[in-house]
């Protein structure tokens, strides 16, 4: 497998995250809640579940495709570190409610999205 392909996919994922995040966070309401980070993480969880189901469950894609798209594109598209930074920032400014809602929604919906993606990918 080519490390270059993983790197190119990672670069594309990072650019996609930046564009999606900027588009969502630039809408009315701004950064009262980190919707851009939330959206890419939930979408990425769904897509990685789907990709895994298609590779492992159905064998429709080669395992190498899962590595390039999963570790490369989706690994760069989603962002655990930015999510934690958003939580820290909410706590720093004393907005414990926003931090709790962000943590609960991101974790709960992220797990649900991954499960849904797996179910769709496996065909169940």
Curated annotation (Swiss-Prot):
Reactions this protein catalyses: fluoride(in) = fluoride(out)
Annotated transmembrane regions: 4-24, 36-56, 67-87, 103-123
GO biological process, one term: cellular detoxification of fluoride
A GO molecular-function annotation: fluoride channel activity
UniProt keyword annotations, A-Z: Cell membrane, Ion channel, Ion transport, Membrane, Metal-binding, Sodium, Transmembrane, Transmembrane helix, Transport
Regulation of activity: Na(+) is not transported, but it plays an essential structural role and its presence is essential for fluoride channel function.
UniProt cross-references to Pfam families, sorted A to Z: CRCB
InterPro entries xrefs: FluC
Any GO CC annotation of this UniProt entry: plasma membrane
Subcellular location: Cell membrane
Membrane topology: Multi-pass membrane protein
Binding site for Na(+): 75, 78
Family under the similarity heading: Belongs to the fluoride channel Fluc/FEX (TC 1.A.43) family.
Function as written in the Swiss-Prot or TrEMBL entry: Fluoride-specific ion channel. Important for reducing fluoride concentration in the cell, thus reducing its toxicity.
Name of the protein described by the UniProt record: Fluoride-specific ion channel FluC 1
Gene (UniProt): fluC1
